[in-house]
């Protein structure tokens, strides 16, 4: 028996599928690339693309007052937790607050590893040492750092009154970006938060770079600097091994101008750890500022 399918039915079905796909895409775009705060676009000559930033101002923001600045990677990820933690910290401090700027990854282009992986490691991250055959593109964290230093920071300084307290925060690949900036442009920030960083890239190359920096650049810390490290106790064994190596590097290379803290959150997996770490990092940084002359 022949089955007859109405052409209008097929057309309507196709339109329904397309409409549903567009709704899903729009929802994903909104969740990823639109924030609950102030969204601004910057035409970056360094990156040769337009980048968006999310700006969270303090609830009692006063344009005549100066504020500390926090820059975080990964845009909306964990942003609600940051808002909650900053609000709670401000209540404890009697109103002192910071401006938080989150940089989302691009939506239609895969930019996360490109921007956050250091230039001495492969974009397609690997546990083994890289081969010098020129076939595997490096990360471009150096360009992303340039964007922050020569485009984003001047833009923010032109719009807001900022003091000298600056924090850079990142999670996972973003944590490795934090460590990259820490050992290549130390003076750019006086606070660094690296949640579950990935120093295992290319046979622990991030650990090696940090170790070499600490051993050979004793004078690099021209100002008191704070570093917060954390990892989840139930993360991948390779992550925990690399984290332990990183801890040992800091333990054996003391510097009077560097205060670093490390927390291992029991029973926490990779995506749990940053949620548990934000308040601790902010509290540690504030204690550091209180002790700094």
Question: Where does each model-flagged region fall?
Answer:
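N-terminal secretory signal peptides that target proteins for export/translocation
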Residues: 1-6
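N-terminal cationic leader/targeting segments used for protein routing and processing
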Residues: 7-9, 13, 292
